[in-house]
Amino acid sequence: MAHGPNYRVKYRRRREGKTNYYKRYTYVINNTTRLVVRLTNKYIIAQIAKFNPKGDVIVVAAHSMELAKKFGWKGDLNNTPAAYLTGYLLGVRALKAGIKEAVADIGLFVPVKGSRIFTAIKGAIDAGLSIPVGDLGIKEDRIKGVHIASYAQKLEAENPELFKRLFSKYLERGLHPKDLPSHFEEILNKIKSGGA
């Protein structure tokens, strides 16, 4: 892989796809508190981070695994409703810690309207955190999981075998997917009532 004498190797964390140094530089210069949202294959992680020369300090954090362990969430841990609940949980914790505003940091993810990252940010905004963002393009039905419930009902009627395979974890945890919107409201009320 020859490049020539003028080739400049990028920083390691940029090569690994972990850090966008141009954006990070602007956050550091402005000394802003950041709402960091990261998606993994299984979970959603949301954190409030402040810059420190020795390394960023995480002030408060929320992990979608907490929804299952502390609040009894039986749905998937990385879908749209879980993203909203994780963001909402982070917003409640941030307000308790005295943080009232933050700037959204989505890292190297491509910003797509209605995505899970923006759903988590919307959850934090609805909890009372002030975050300067434009139109997030998120529909309330998708936040509550109505689209998942309607797809599950349609699939159960057309192909019960595929339904059992795709929604096996829901059924294993004791939640029928058609009940997801009501279960979402139940967990949201638990978080609102001081469960954070």
From Swiss-Prot:
Keywords: Ribonucleoprotein, Ribosomal protein, RNA-binding, rRNA-binding
Keyword check for Transmembrane helix: no
Database matches in InterPro entries: Rbsml_uL18_euk
Keyword rRNA-binding: yes
Coiled-coil ranges (or none): none
GO terms for biological process, alphabetical: ribosomal large subunit assembly; translation
Gene Ontology molecular function terms on file: 5S rRNA binding; structural constituent of ribosome
Free-text function comment from the UniProt entry: This is one of the proteins that bind and probably mediate the attachment of the 5S RNA into the large ribosomal subunit, where it forms part of the central protuberance.
Subunit: Part of the 50S ribosomal subunit. Contacts the 5S and 23S rRNAs.
PANTHER family reported for this sequence: LARGE RIBOSOMAL SUBUNIT PROTEIN UL18 (PTHR23410:SF12), RIBOSOMAL PROTEIN L5-RELATED (PTHR23410)
Family of this protein: Belongs to the universal ribosomal protein uL18 family.
The name this protein goes by in its record: Large ribosomal subunit protein uL18
Taxonomic lineage: Archaea, Thermoproteota, Thermoprotei, Sulfolobales, Sulfolobaceae
